Amino acid sequence: MPIKPGEEVIFVVPINKIKKRVPRWKRAPRAARFVREWIARHAKADEVIIGTDVNEKIWERGAEKPPGKLRVKVVVEESEGKRIARVSLA
């Protein structure tokens, strides 16, 4: 069941899934991409806008040590027939 436009939902994104699959120095950039893909899949969104607070949390400990999981708040909006998900820290 997709999220209705205007509805807020809390997700816990499991970043640990990709940590061992990529080189250490690529972990934070790959984690940011993974968050975008994961939210797009679970919120059924065409576009995902990640807030600066989420990006700073991913990069907080450097490129090699992103957090294992991330608790985020997702708000889905609909404009011009596209579903846009805005992601911020919960």
Swiss-Prot record:
<dbReference type="GO" id="GO:0022625">
    <property type="term" value="C:cytosolic large ribosomal subunit"/>
</dbReference>
<comment type="similarity">
    <text>Belongs to the eukaryotic ribosomal protein eL31 family.</text>
</comment>
<dbReference type="InterPro" id="IPR023621">
    <property type="entry name" value="Ribosomal_eL31_dom_sf"/>
</dbReference>
<protein>
    <recommendedName>
        <fullName>Large ribosomal subunit protein eL31</fullName>
    </recommendedName>
</protein>
<keyword id="KW-0687">Ribonucleoprotein</keyword>
<dbReference type="Pfam" id="PF01198">
    <property type="entry name" value="Ribosomal_L31e"/>
</dbReference>
<comment type="subunit">
    <text>Part of the 50S ribosomal subunit.</text>
</comment>
<dbReference type="InterPro" id="IPR020052">
    <property type="entry name" value="Ribosomal_eL31_CS"/>
</dbReference>
<dbReference type="GO" id="GO:0003735">
    <property type="term" value="F:structural constituent of ribosome"/>
</dbReference>
<dbReference type="InterPro" id="IPR000054">
    <property type="entry name" value="Ribosomal_eL31"/>
</dbReference>
<keyword id="KW-0689">Ribosomal protein</keyword>
<dbReference type="GO" id="GO:0002181">
    <property type="term" value="P:cytoplasmic translation"/>
</dbReference>
